[in-house]
């Protein structure tokens, strides 16, 4: 029994050494490209790793010599599936406590919306919140100031996310009320950065539960039909 434990320990050390060696080559390449803060994760492609950067998702060979820019699609099913966004769902889950949520009484679908309080179609979506909720659609908001993190919209949304009643503050802002300055540990910069990784180009940007991103506004009934069809597609294998 002791021999087995020793052999297992040696094997574990050997494998971890290989993993460190692979990551070392990758990190050396990333450092050379000015991507020191990038996060390296496993990839669904053999011999490659996923790299999460401030500007998007990349894929790099384990020897650090070849680099591809995402997204990556699985085309083995009936329709292409964005594998990259499946990976990003982990980061989305980590922000659950920071989301401003409008929960449906009889929930059938959950969508996460990257929003901007200065966006016309974001206002239109929010004005119909009762209709979305009545159909069984729960809406979760993350902040995505289209003009960047130095914009006034970013400062206002940061304040909204820092008050005790975020829903009330968000409702007021969407009605055109002035936003009172507030500060806290919550950083909507993390929301914005995740939006960049998801490839968000404008708002509203809707993320489905499997990581699929649907750009733009959709009326409640059309949204419900799309969500039902998407769910049925996933059940049938894509």
UniProtKB/Swiss-Prot annotation:
> Which PROSITE patterns does this one have?
THIOREDOXIN_1, THIOREDOXIN_2
An example of a Pfam family matching this protein is Thioredoxin_2
Q: Where is the Thioredoxin domain?
A: 61-232
Sequence intervals crossing the membrane:
none
| Protein keywords | Disulfide bond, Periplasm, Redox-active center, Signal
Q: Where in the cell is it found?
A: Periplasm
Name which cysteines form disulfide bonds: 119-122
**Signal peptide location in the record?**
1-21
Write out the GO MF terms. Answer: disulfide oxidoreductase activity
Q: Which GO terms describe its cellular component?
A: periplasmic space
Identify the domain of life.
Bacteria
Q: Which family is this sequence assigned to?
A: Belongs to the thioredoxin family. DsbC subfamily.
Q: How does it assemble?
A: Homodimer.
NCBIfam families under this entry?
PRK10877.1
As for what it does, the entry says:
Required for disulfide bond formation in some periplasmic proteins. Acts by transferring its disulfide bond to other proteins and is reduced in the process. DsbC is reoxidized by a yet uncharacterized protein. Also acts as a disulfide isomerase.
- What name is this protein filed under? Thiol:disulfide interchange protein DsbC
């Amino acid at each position: 029994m002791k021999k087995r434990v020793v052999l297992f320990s040696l094997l574990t050390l050997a494998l971890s050494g290989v993993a460190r060696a692979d990551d070392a080559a990758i990190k050396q390449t990333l450092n050379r490209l000015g991507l020191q803060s990038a996060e390296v994760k496993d990839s669904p492609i053999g011999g490659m790793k996923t790299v999460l950067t401030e500007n998007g998702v990349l894929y790099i060979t384990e020897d650090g010599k070849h680099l591809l820019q995402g997204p990556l699609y699985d085309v083995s099913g009936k329709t292409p599936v964005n594998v990259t966004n499946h990976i990003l769902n982990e980061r989305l889950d980590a922000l659950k406590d920071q989301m401003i949520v409008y929960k449906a009484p009889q929930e059938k679908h959950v969508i996460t919306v990257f929003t901007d309080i200065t966006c016309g179609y974001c206002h239109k979506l929010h004005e119909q919140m009762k209709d979305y909720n009545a159909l069984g659609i729960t809406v979760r908001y993350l902040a995505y100031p289209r003009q960047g993190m130095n914009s006034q919209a970013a400062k206002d949304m940061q304040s909204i996310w820092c008050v005790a009643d975020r829903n009330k503050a968000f409702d007021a802002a969407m009605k055109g009320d002035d936003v009172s300055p507030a500060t806290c540990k919550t950083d909507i910069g993390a929301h914005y950065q995740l939006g960049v990784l998801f490839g968000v180009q404008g708002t509203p940007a809707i993320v489905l539960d499997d990581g699929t991103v649907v750009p733009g506004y959709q009326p409640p009934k059309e949204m419900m039909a799309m969500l039902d069809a998407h769910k049925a597609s996933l059940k049938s294998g894509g």
